[in-house]
Structure formats: C-alpha cells, structure tokens
C-alpha cells in the first residue's frame, strides 16, 4: 500500500498502509533494532520466500523443519546447516545471511527515504502488540508527517497483534482482553468512513489520530501522535524488584541475577513455535 501511495497516480485518492514494512533491518520482520529475528524469519522463509511461477494456483509453502523444542533445535544449528534445510531457491534467506550489518543492501530496500510529496490521503494502521511490523507503522506515520506535511494524514494505533484490526473476533492477547468490539469499531467507525469520505465525498473528515488506551480500554482522539497532552513520567527500578516514580536515595542499591543461555529462564509454555502471545506470556 505504501508503494502504491508513492506512485503519484492521479486516480489514486486514498491509501491505507496497515502494518507497513518500512525498514527490514531497523525494526520490521527480519530484524528488530538490528537483531536478527531468527525464529520468526526462518519460519517465514519456509512459506513466503519460495520462488514460484505466476499465476499461483496452489499453496507452495514448505513444512517447517523446526523441531519440537525450538530453542534446542536452533542451538544445534550453524548458518550453513540452517540454509541446507531450505531449498536453494530461497534467495532472500541467503541474502539475509550475507548482509548481517546495516549496509547498502538494507538501505536500498528501506522506504524511509521515499516518504515525501505523497498525494493521496493516508490512513496508517498499527498495532501496539504487532510482533512483525510495529516499527513500520509508527515510523511511517512519523516520517510522512515530517517530510510530507501537505499530505492528508491519519493514524490509528490500537492494542492489536499483527493483523488483528481485521479480525472481527479479536478480543486481546493471551489473558489480557480489550473488549469484543475493538476491531469491529475500527472497521465500522474509522476505516469505512475514511474511504467513504475520500472516495465518495460523503460523511465527515476523519479525525487525524485514533489511539486505543489499553489502560481504560477506550478510543481517544487527538491531533497528533504521541499526543501533546501526554503526561510523561519517569519510572525507576528498585532493588526489591518493584517500580517507583521516585528515584532511590541509596546510591549503592543493585539487583543481580544469573543469565545462562544453556539454561534459559522460560517465558513460553510451548517451545515448539512462536505465536503472537509471546509478548505477554511472561506477565
């Protein structure tokens, strides 16, 4: 959707980049803050990176080779053995391994440098619990607002996992529930009116920003995100394992723990795969 918006085609009036990929090294899909999302991208490779002819008439995905204990399975693999477990047609996987640092390969594939002079109205949609492309949504909005100020820009940020905004049954993540109408409200009261206004000229101009406050489970409307009305607080770690809004007066306080990769502290009940609830599973 972002690439379509950049085309400048005169017939294109409104575009909604939803969980848009912005930079594959800084924060979307392949890497998060430069760290390779190994389990995610390796699993993804088995069904998304495979070369195929067009048009596609059947699912060409491959069964995941990851064993029942994913942590142990990856520990016993080298980059070469990981590659050999996949067909040699998976060119993108090989290129990921060939470019472990932020070099020209990743810069050329980044959308950041192109987000300017955007003509159609834009509705960027992102999820606070999107394990794949949270970076892309936040920074696509931020960069369009900065570099393309004439664009009619709108932003929606909800307590969704990846793609949850179009799941009518989405209630929350794990045991944390946000209400049964979170996605239904978005589709009925935000997304549909956006396209109706810009494509048909009907209804009211949409609000610039809709943000779902997970503490109160309510939608909030504001002119920009982050809102100028936010009250920022500094939270301090305390030696008793708690949190405080006041700094400790004990300059010598500390907390210690042992981190042993060979015996990790578990945070997922099921180690055979990665699902969307891993972001809250240790809470």
Residue ranges of predicted features:
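Alpha/beta-hydrolase-fold catalytic nucleophile elbow
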Residues: 16-19, 156-159, 238
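Secondary-structure transition/capping motifs at alpha-helix termini
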Residues: 7-13, 132, 143-154, 197-202
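Short beta-strand/loop motif that positions the catalytic acidic residue
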Residues: 118, 124-126
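C-terminal, loop-rich substrate-recognition/catalytic regions characterized by aromatic stacking residues
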Residues: 64-68, 73-78, 165, 172-283
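Conserved alpha/beta-hydrolase "acid-adjacent" motif
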Residues: 131-138
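Accessory cap/linker subdomain of secreted extracellular hydrolases
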Residues: 6-8, 13-117
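Short helix immediately C-terminal to the catalytic nucleophile in hydrolase catalytic domains
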Residues: 1-5
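Catalytic histidine neighborhood in serine/cysteine hydrolases
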Residues: 145-170
């Amino acid at each position: 959707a972002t690439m379509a918006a950049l085309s400048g085609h005169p017939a294109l009036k409104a575009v909604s980049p939803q969980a848009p990929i912005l930079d594959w090294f800084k924060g979307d899909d392949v890497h998060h803050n430069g760290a390779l999302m190994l389990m995610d991208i390796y699993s993804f490779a088995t069904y998304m990176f495979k070369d195929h002819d067009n048009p596609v008439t059947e699912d060409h995905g491959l069964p995941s080779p990851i064993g029942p204990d994913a942590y142990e399975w990856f520990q016993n693999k080298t980059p070469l053995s990981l590659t050999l477990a996949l067909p040699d047609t998976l060119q993108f996987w090989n290129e990921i391994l060939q470019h472990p640092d932020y070099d020209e390969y990743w810069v050329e594939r980044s959308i950041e440098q192109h987000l300017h002079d955007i003509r159609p109205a834009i509705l960027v949609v992102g999820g606070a619990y999107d394990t794949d492309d949270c970076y892309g949504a936040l920074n696509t909005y931020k960069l369009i607002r900065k570099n393309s100020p004439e664009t009619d820009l709108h932003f929606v940020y909800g307590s969704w996992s990846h793609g949850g905004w179009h799941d009518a049954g989405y209630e929350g993540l794990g045991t944390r529930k946000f209400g049964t109408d979170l996605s239904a409200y978005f589709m009925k009261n935000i997304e549909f009116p956006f396209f109706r206004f810009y494509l048909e000229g009907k209804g009211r101009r949409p609000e610039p920003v809709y943000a779902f406050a997970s503490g109160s489970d309510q939608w909030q409307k504001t002119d920009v995100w982050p809102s100028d009305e936010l009250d920022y607080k500094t939270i301090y770690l305390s030696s008793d394992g708690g949190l405080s809004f006041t700094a400790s007066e004990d300059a010598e306080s500390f907390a210690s723990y042992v981190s042993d990769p060979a015996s990790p502290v578990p945070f997922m009940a099921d180690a055979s795969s990665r699902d969307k609830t891993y972001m809250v599973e240790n809470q």
